[in-house]
């Protein structure tokens, strides 16, 4: 499939890329935990997320039709963008006074091409570990590939653990009428990751090729305790404290990576 396919009519394939990105930290006191949540809330507020998604849309070569964003109380934010493969000119009657589109009309387009992000800061009630999760979905219809946004999104967040799902649905036809269920070569999401990303992460694939379903899990190879402490540093901890915190953080990260709780 290295050559460009000649299609009959519009490319009806829907390509969906989903991320779950986790940032883990240890905040020793309740005050530090609250400060971490506040920091994350500010660092990834709706305005910042809107800029990240705007960059994503530009990277994949799409055009923004509509933006909806919201910061939540006590914490968290979300942004949704409707996008199109080609720039959509305003309708001829856009300057006339008339009722706007019904919600159904907007949601109908959401089923085709959209970019969304939702954030979920949280903390353990008594062991000092706090996590931040960002869920990102990039769904496109047509020739646009969401895979182009892979590396940018991973590097836009403090990504300790990343879970990625990519699927292609629907079919399009070539000029002879034969159905095509995928229009590009892929055997792993890892093929689309930059070399520095591949070197930084340990990765596991679970792929169902016959269903055009690809799944990759990533966890940072290097563990530097100082990078995971919020409000304190390794120099302020004795050897036993540092060892205990390191063990708890690594256990937390492995549990999230494998999606299962582990015995103490």
From Swiss-Prot:
EC number: 4.1.1.50
Top EC group: lyase
GO biological process: spermidine biosynthetic process
Pathway: Amine and polyamine biosynthesis; S-adenosylmethioninamine biosynthesis; S-adenosylmethioninamine from S-adenosyl-L-methionine: step 1/1
Keywords: Autocatalytic cleavage, Decarboxylase, Lyase, Polyamine biosynthesis, Pyruvate, S-adenosyl-L-methionine, Schiff base, Spermidine biosynthesis, Zymogen
Cofactor binding note: Binds 1 pyruvoyl group covalently per subunit.
Site feature (Cleavage (non-hydrolytic)) residues: 112-113
Gene Ontology terms, MF aspect: adenosylmethionine decarboxylase activity
Transport found in the keyword field: no
Cofactors: pyruvate
Superkingdom per UniProt: Bacteria
GO cellular component, one term: cytosol
Modified residues (Pyruvic acid (Ser)): 113
Disulfide bonds: none
Function comment: Catalyzes the decarboxylation of S-adenosylmethionine to S-adenosylmethioninamine (dcAdoMet), the propylamine donor required for the synthesis of the polyamines spermine and spermidine from the diamine putrescine.
Subunit architecture: Heterooctamer of four alpha and four beta chains arranged as a tetramer of alpha/beta heterodimers.
Protein name: S-adenosylmethionine decarboxylase proenzyme
Organism: Hahella chejuensis (strain KCTC 2396)
